[in-house]
Amino acid sequence: RRQRQMCIRDSLYTVHDAEEAVKRIVTCEYGTTLQIADGVKVRFVDAGHLLGSASVEMWLTEGDDTRKVVFSGDIGNRDQPIIRDPQYIRDADYVLTESTYGDRLHDMDKDPDYTADLAAIIDETLGNGGNVIIPSFAVGRTQELLYFIREMKEQGLVKSVPGFSVVVDSPLAGEATRIFSGDLHGYLDEEAIAAPVSYTHLRAHETRSNL
């Protein structure tokens, strides 16, 4: 807005507001039912979308009447790498949910081989002396890519340059990858724990000058 000489609007929230909000955060485990107010109970279940993502079950009681409301952002698919499958909620009186793909049906019978497809592209590009640049969301997608790249390295699918280096040049993606590489039993699926996203020839850089 400043470059376009447009009116600069004041932020709705300040850094101080954010710091004060963080002090009020209370953590809880998936599947734990909490009484957060009179007549209000909540329970978080794994949404299988991003690390720590959750759908929320709410039981609202007024007098003798109890209604169940479910709220959720994105819900993940089954059999995805790293993140556990979503826990499905079977009943509710009202549901509020993110619906980017609400008018599509995912074909769960197809089992695309992402590792082989990506390996073929990387193998051809490196064999021709090039580099592969993959734009990716810092949290979730980057770690999935690193997981697939680890698989192709272990299976020897990139024959032109078997020991090729992998560089993550986003500070946020690098920090997220370090979190994914920690002790996350109960949050990652067993395959991801057995084959983490951190491996030889993987580098994360905070600034461009380090590339």
Features from the language model and the residues they span:
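Conserved small/polar residues in nucleotide/adenosyl-binding loops
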Residues: 3-10, 200-207
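Glycine-rich nucleotide/cofactor/substrate-binding loop typically near the N-terminus or early
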Residues: 14
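Core dinuclear metal-dependent hydrolase active-site scaffold
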Residues: 20-84, 209
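Functional cores that coordinate and move charged inorganic groups
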Residues: 56-59, 65-148
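Hard-cation-handling environments
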Residues: 121-203, 209
